[in-house]
Amino acid sequence: MTPWNLVGMARVKGLDVIALTDHNTARNTPEAMAAGEAYGVQVIPGMEITSREEVHILGYFSSVPEALAAGEAVYAHLPQVQNQPALFGNQIIIGADDSPSGTLEKLLINATDLSVEEVCALVRAFGGVPVPAHINRGSNGMIGALGLMPFLPDYPVVEVYPGVPCPAYATKGRFVIHSSDAHRLEDIQERIFSLDTHPTARDVMRLLRALDGRQIPQNGI
């Protein structure tokens, strides 16, 4: 699933704003942004970071430079375990015209040596918004990995996996987002929610950042 294929399918599905969140890297965000410009889809640069507890934390950023800088920091915290293409496939960096321009050597599906709290702090240090991913999913969700949804530190925004029960306490007092968590083109879902205001990626990031600080914008998005 290349950036251009991903954004093209999002266009077909009628999605206006999407986020690209590869595991533990943001190296493909530049081409995703280029594809978004071409297809008329707003793209939020990001990544899905694996903590040492095997919890997935989404990091959303306002710009490609922020995402790339955060991605380099995350990559440095991965163990020195090389990818085995025969088992896991090539970890390709996509360049211009959707063509391969390189590969990433470390195995990206590994956990970093950062705790959940440290991952969130790193994302915020680079200007991003951390969001615990699919908290209600058995694998790599916060509830499944930790046995509960912690109240501290504060997680103002959480992502819930659709179609799977989620304990009410886990989302109480929190802002909830949903995603298709697509790893294949056919997994990309059609939109569930729509807004009359036609928000841009910048608008969505402004709202997420406000929610992360538990500030409700007076004029909404």
Which residues are covered by each model-predicted region?
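Charged catalytic cores and adjacent phosphate/nucleic-acid-binding surfaces used
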Residues: 1-15, 26-68, 107-108, 121, ...
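Alpha-helix-centered segments that form part of catalytic cores
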Residues: 90-126
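Active-site gating loops and adjacent loop-to-helix segments of metal-dependent hydrolytic enzymes
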Residues: 62-104, 148
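Conserved Rossmann-like nucleotide-binding pocket used by diverse enzymes
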Residues: 19
